[in-house]
UniProtKB/Swiss-Prot annotation:
Active-site residues, record numbering mapped to chain: D49 (nucleophile)
Gene: truB
GO biological process: mRNA pseudouridine synthesis; tRNA pseudouridine synthesis
EC number from the UniProt entry: 5.4.99.25
Record-linked InterPro entries: PsdUridine_synth_cat_dom_sf, PsdUridine_synth_N, PUA-like_sf, PUA_sf, tRNA_psdUridine_synth_TruB, tRNA_sdUridine_synth_fam1_C, TruB_C
Keyword annotations of the record: Isomerase, tRNA processing
Similarity field: Belongs to the pseudouridine synthase TruB family. Type 1 subfamily.
Organism of origin: Aeromonas salmonicida (strain A449)
Role, per record: Responsible for synthesis of pseudouridine from uracil-55 in the psi GC loop of transfer RNAs.
Protein name, UniProt field: tRNA pseudouridine synthase B
Superkingdom per UniProt: Bacteria
Lineage of the species this protein comes from: Bacteria, Pseudomonadati, Pseudomonadota, Gammaproteobacteria, Aeromonadales
Alphabetized NCBIfam families for the sequence: TruB (TIGR00431)
GO molecular function ontology, one term from the record: tRNA pseudouridine(55) synthase activity
Transmembrane segments annotated in the record for this chain: none
Length: 319
């Protein structure tokens, strides 16, 4: 019996800034983008809740090797919270577990926000993807099991009050990796004494990626269908929308080297490069074209040692 040939998709590399719609999981939209691009490999860079919208960088091909740098990057959010109701998920997708009157003055709210600025400790929500004994916490939560969680250090660089009307508060948050906005709102509600939960959440920035470069699923699907209708290979319209994969590591200092030196790096060898930093990770480029070949790390001898290298396949792409 012959085995059916597995379809692998095509070799495409880059980062798409997707404007995630509400109501879908991050994996839902990842699979849709992967299918539209017919990509062999794809991964996202930090899940957004189904309720949330906004920037979700999707890494395709070799760009997936550098997704961790975006996971660790700062984020910006716009969040709307409803005071007076606390839910089991800390957002409007959950069940209301307590209702309290809202007697919050503007001055009290402004003063309370001070407690959540700067380096703080935060206890993650039970409805999160953090793992306990190999299982995400939300699975335990759905079974009614409460797992003790340790508070984790996070940093809230900015916390701006946008508006406060009735029982609705709108905030803008600039925070470090690992920050749960739902937990932030839930904690704020407890400090105010009335409870609170998230009703709208939008991620507006990851690292330094520009807001205006985001694309919706509808836009991608429209581009794909229009290309097919005009007998144009969809890749010709879709691939230019991708950002270069090295934008994921743009914060790292660049080390530019000659092609002859890069040949040793591509074989896994550490090399001496004039002008390299004394320590830390670096973004490695080659020649005057500054072709990105991966991320290196300065070893104990001051050499640039390869850490993650870009590898392109030689075979022809599959449509």
């Amino acid at each position: 019996m012959s085995r059916r040939r597995r379809f692998k998709g095509r070799d495409v590399h880059g980062i798409l800034l997707l404007d995630k719609p509400t109501g879908l999981t991050s994996n839902d939209v990842l699979q849709k983008v992967k299918r539209i691009y017919n990509a062999a490999k794809a991964g996202h860079t930090g899940a957004l809740d189904p309720l949330a919208t906004g920037m979700l960088p999707i890494c395709l091909g070799e760009a997936t090797k550098f997704s961790q740098y975006l996971l660790e990057a700062d984020k910006r959010y716009e969040v709307t919270a409803k005071l007076g109701e606390r839910t089991n998920t800390s957002d409007s997708d959950g069940e209301v577990v307590s209702t309290r009157p809202v007697n919050v003055a503007l001055g009290t709210l402004i003063e309370s926000l001070d407690q959540f600025r700067g380096p703080i400790m935060q206890v993650p929500s039970m409805y999160s993807a953090l793992k306990h004994n190999g299982r995400p916490l939300y699975e335990y939560a759905r079974e009614g099991i409460e797992i003790e969680r340790e508070a984790r250090p996070i940093t809230v660089f900015e916390l701006k009050l946008i508006s406060f009307e009735g029982d609705e508060v709108k905030l803008e948050v600039h925070c470090s990796k690992g920050t749960y906005i739902r937990s932030l709102v839930d904690d704020l509600g407890e400090v105010l004494g009335c409870g609170a939960h998230v009703t709208q959440l939008r991620r507006t920035q990851v690292a330094t990626y520009p807001y205006e470069r985001m694309l919706t699923l509808e836009q991608l699907e429209c581009i794909f269908e229009q290309a097919k209708a005009e007998s144009i290979p969809p890749r010709e319209q879709l691939d230019p929308l991708l950002l270069p994969m090295d934008t994921a590591v743009a914060a790292l200092p660049e080390v530019n080297m000659l092609a002859a030196v890069a040949a040793y790096v591509n074989q896994g060898q550490a090399v001496q490069v004039a002008g390299a930093p004394q320590s830390g990770q670096v973004r490695m480029t080659v020649g005057p074209e500054r072709e990105f070949i991966g991320v290196g790390e300065i070893d104990d001898e001051g050499r640039v040692a390869p850490k993650r290298l870009v590898r392109y396949h030689d075979e022809h792409d599959e449509e």
